[in-house]
Structure formats: C-alpha cells, structure tokens
Amino acid sequence: IRCFITPDITSKDCPNGHVCYTKTWCDGFCSRRGERVDLGCAATCPTVKTGVDIQCCSTDDCDPFPTRKRP
C-alpha cells in the first residue's frame, strides 16, 4: 500500500498489512493556522484520543492532505 507521509506529503510504500491514516488536532495556534495534520501508515489504525480525529483507509494514496477551513 502507498500512503502520503508528513512532513513531505509524499506518497511512499508502506509494509504489507499496514493502513494509511490522517490524524488532525488543535494546538495553541489552531485559531490562526488551523488544525495540525499528521499523515502516515501504521500496522493498525491509531487509537483515538480526546481532541484528536483519526481517519484510516486501506487503498493506495487514500490519505491526501485535508482541505483546511479558514480560521
């Protein structure tokens, strides 16, 4: 599977059986810069924590950089 990976936002091969993920959350600059974004691949979908949104998928390049809402 190929997933987009931050910080370069380039598509890279991930090991067999892995999933792609998009993780977004707010930090102290969220009101000015928008949500923080982490793209990558993992053996399993990361555990969701309070204040963090995680989307997982299992097809090539299914985790593009999300469109940001203007603050």
From Swiss-Prot:
Tissue expression per record: Expressed by the venom gland.
Keywords: Acetylcholine receptor inhibiting toxin, Disulfide bond, Ion channel impairing toxin, Neurotoxin, Postsynaptic neurotoxin, Secreted, Toxin
Cited InterPro entries: Snake_3FTx, Snake_toxin-like_sf, Snake_toxin_con_site, Toxin_cobra-type
Transmembrane segments: none
Gene Ontology terms for molecular function: acetylcholine receptor inhibitor activity; ion channel regulator activity; toxin activity
Keyword Disulfide bond: yes
A GO cellular component entry from the record: extracellular region
Highest taxon of the lineage: Eukaryota
Coiled coil: none
Keyword Lipid biosynthesis belongs to the record: no
Subcellular location(s) per record: Secreted
Cited Pfam families: Toxin_cobra-type (PF21947)
Disulfide bonds: 3-20, 14-41, 26-30, 45-56, 57-62
Role noted for this protein: Binds with high affinity to muscular (alpha-1/CHRNA1) and neuronal (alpha-7/CHRNA7) nicotinic acetylcholine receptor (nAChR) and inhibits acetylcholine from binding to the receptor, thereby impairing neuromuscular and neuronal transmission.
Protein family according to the UniProt entry: Belongs to the three-finger toxin family. Long-chain subfamily. Type II alpha-neurotoxin sub-subfamily.
Protein name: Long neurotoxin 5
Organism, as annotated: Naja naja (Indian cobra)
